[in-house]
A protein has these predicted regions:
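Sequence-specific dsDNA recognition surfaces
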Residues: 23-35, 49-80
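Short, surface-exposed secondary-structure boundary micro-motifs
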Residues: 86, 174-176
Length: 205
């Protein structure tokens, strides 16, 4: 299944479309930079490690005290978190906000809010994860000794090719079907492994 996704990945995004700068199809914002709490109390905020697995992991968030403009930082369904400060290998890591996580946008990640009139948020998320885009991020990032970074302005200049909405919908539906099948296979494999371990334990009782 993964090889199938990789194969489709290289083809479906080569369709004709209109060239935009990324900053023209989404709002790009930096996160809240207030001090984080040592205790797990207050508002949950995203951190680099929150999206290290390419999806939101609520076990790896930070916490901050409530602040006046907090609602401006609350992540909404359709937002995309983008890792712009990381090692070169992980620069450009993203996570799609697919539901309300009651999570706020923290520092060291950029928040991309797509313009729904131009691009379907999930389509933009998929596009940012193509090899072509990931290789570009690795090429244009500023490389230091221990980490790399892409500033907000440079990211906004990234050229993306956006087809019409109907084409975007078809691609999103295809990928969603593939993702659902992958998750189903992972779950089935997990159940199989648990059953196998249980049977092995029973043999030695």
């Amino acid at each position: 299944m993964q090889s199938l996704i990789k194969g489709i990945n290289q083809r479906v995004f080569m369709n004709n479309g209109i060239n935009y700068k990324l900053g023209e199809v989404c709002e790009i914002r930096s996160g809240y930079s207030g001090n984080q709490l040592l205790s797990k109390k207050g508002l949950k905020v995203s951190r680099i490690e929150t999206i290290s697995g390419h999806k939101v992991n609520l076990e790896r968030v930070g916490y901050v005290a409530p602040f006046e403009s907090s609602e401006n930082y609350k992540l909404q369904v359709g937002d995309i978190l983008f890792s712009n400060i990381n090692s070169v290998e992980y620069i450009g890591n993203t996570a799609f906000i697919d539901k309300d996580y009651d999570l706020y946008h923290g520092m060291n990640l950029l928040r991309l809010t797509p313009n729904n009139m131009v691009v379907i948020p999930f389509y933009l998320y998929l596009l940012l994860n193509t090899n072509r885009m990931l290789n570009r991020f690795k090429t244009v990032c500023n490389k230091a000794v221990s980490q790399a970074s892409i500033n907000q302005t440079e990211l906004g200049k990234t050229v993306v090719q956006i087809p019409d909405i109907n084409a975007q919908k078809q691609i999103c539906e295809l990928y969603q079907a593939l993702y659902d099948k992958l998750e189903s296979e992972k779950y089935a494999n997990s159940l199989f492994q648990k059953q196998k371990q249980y049977l092995l334990r029973q043999m030695f009782i």
